[in-house]
């Protein structure tokens, strides 16, 4: 857990001081090893044949070691800019426990840092992807809503237009039907009037004709009767004259 925390802090420090992650990890490995095995480092420094001394520590390392021993936050990382990282890499290989202790810790820390970096990148990528997906989903929902609204408005407009057209056609049909009915009624009334007039005229004409015929017949009958009566009288008179003539001849 301590290495993970150091790795994360080191990553922050690397970004702040423009150092590579490997250089930060090497510094953290040596600082933690000195802190955990201080007596061994003191003994090594006292051995003149080791070529190692506390005074030969890379610049800035001792200051960071002291700050790290009492650190309660990551403020000690501000001292990283004062460290000679090239000298730190050289010092790691000078101590006799480099291969047995420092290198495994460094490899572990580098692996953790790589994992943490990968995790951070993956998290950032996932977040970006989620944001992009959310934006696309939102855009798609807004587009669908706009299309649905446009479709609803269009349908409503079409329905209104259709209803208005149907109403207008119905009104026009009703008006036409009413006009036709009125015209038909007027025509029927005119026809009835014409028929009544024609019938009345015909009846009047017929009555007049019949009257004239009747008058004619009466006149004719009267004339015939008069002529018959006159003829009969004349015949009687004639016959009387004849008889009287015959009687005279006989006498």
From Swiss-Prot:
Induction: Induced during anaerobic growth and strongly by cold shock.
Propeptide segments, given as residue ranges: 232-251
Gene Ontology molecular-function annotations: structural constituent of cell wall
PIR1/2/ repeat start and end residues: 207-225
Protein modification: The GPI-anchor is attached to the protein in the endoplasmic reticulum and serves to target the protein to the cell surface. There, the glucosamine-inositol phospholipid moiety is cleaved off and the GPI-modified mannoprotein is covalently attached via its lipidless GPI glycan remnant to the 1,6-beta-glucan of the outer cell wall layer. Covalently linked to beta-1,3-glucan of the inner cell wall layer via an alkali-sensitive ester linkage between the gamma-carboxyl group of glutamic acids, arising from a specific glutamine within the PIR1/2/3 repeat, and hydroxyl groups of glucoses of beta-1,3-glucan chains.
GO terms for cellular component: cell periphery; extracellular region; fungal-type cell wall; fungal-type vacuole; side of membrane
UniProt keyword annotations, A-Z: Cell wall, Glycoprotein, GPI-anchor, Lipoprotein, Membrane, Secreted, Signal, Stress response
GO BP of this protein: cellular response to freezing; fungal-type cell wall organization
Covalent attachment to cell wall glycan (site feature) positions: 217
Lipid sites, type GPI-anchor amidated glycine: 231
UniProt cross-references to InterPro entries, sorted A to Z: SRP1_TIP1, Yeast_PIR_rpt, Yeast_SRP1/TIP1_CWP
Signal peptide: 1-18
Listed Pfam families: PIR, SRP1_TIP1
Localization: Secreted, Cell wall; Membrane
Bilayer topology annotation: Lipid-anchor; GPI-anchor
Entry function: Component of the cell wall.
Protein family: Belongs to the SRP1/TIP1 family.
Protein name from the UniProt record: Cold shock-induced protein TIR2
Organism name: Saccharomyces cerevisiae (strain ATCC 204508 / S288c) (Baker's yeast)
